[in-house]
From Swiss-Prot:
Species for this entry: Salmonella newport (strain SL254)
GO annotation terms (biological process): iron-sulfur cluster assembly
InterPro entries given in the database record: Fe-S_cluster_asmbl/transfer, FeS_biogenesis, FeS_cluster_insertion, FeS_cluster_insertion_CS, HesB-like_dom_sf, IscA_proteobacteria
Assigned protein family: Belongs to the HesB/IscA family.
Gene designation: iscA
NCBIfam families, alphabetized: iron-sulfur cluster assembly accessory protein (TIGR00049), IscA (TIGR02011), PRK09502.1 (NF007049)
Pfam family, one: Fe-S_biosyn
Keyword Cell wall biogenesis/degradation (UniProt): no
Summary of the function given for this chain in its UniProt record: Is able to transfer iron-sulfur clusters to apo-ferredoxin. Multiple cycles of [2Fe2S] cluster formation and transfer are observed, suggesting that IscA acts catalytically. Recruits intracellular free iron so as to provide iron for the assembly of transient iron-sulfur cluster in IscU in the presence of IscS, L-cysteine and the thioredoxin reductase system TrxA/TrxB.
Subunit and interaction comment: Homodimer; may form tetramers and higher multimers.
Binding site for Fe cation: 35, 99, 101
Signal peptide: none
Name by which UniProt lists this protein: Iron-binding protein IscA
Keywords of the record: Iron, Metal-binding
GO MF, one annotated term: iron ion binding
C-alpha cells in the first residue's frame, strides 16, 4: 500500500505547512459526493488518529484513514499549473470512471 507525491506536490505542501506554522502533515481521504459517487478530501492534520495509516514521501507525511485507504492505494498526488489555474491533481489507479466536470469519481 502506498501514497506518493510528485516533487511539485511535496514542495507545495511544505510551503502550506510552513505558512500555517504547525501541522503533522496532510490528510488525504474520500467522501461521498457528486454524480459519480466519491470526491477527494485534502486537509491539514495536527495529530494522526490511532486507526490512521501514515505514509511519508519526499519529507511529507500523508495521513489516510482506513476506510479511504482502499480507494486511494497507489495514488500519486501532483501539483500542476495549467494557464492561470493551479492545484492538486490525483492520479488514482483505482478510478474506473469520473464525472464530466472532474469533481467526483467511481471505483
Amino acid at each position: 500500500m502506498s501514497i506518493t507525491l510528485s516533487d511539485s506536490a511535496a514542495a507545495r505542501v511544505n510551503i502550506f505547512l510552513a505558512n500555517r506554522g504547525k501541522g503533522f502533515g496532510l490528510r488525504l481521504g474520500v467522501r461521498t459526493s457528486g454524480c459519480s459517487g466519491m470526491a477527494y478530501v485534502l486537509e491539514f492534520v495536527d495529530e494522526p488518529m490511532a486507526e490512521d495509516t501514515v505514509f511519508e514521501d519526499k519529507g511529507v507525511k500523508v495521513v489516510v484513514d482506513g476506510k479511504s485507504l482502499q480507494f486511494l492505494d497507489g495514488t500519486q498526488l501532483d501539483f500542476v499549473k495549467e494557464g492561470l489555474n493551479e492545484g492538486f491533481k490525483f492520479s488514482n489507479p483505482n478510478v474506473k470512471d469520473e464525472c464530466g466536470c472532474g469533481e467526483s469519481f467511481h471505483v
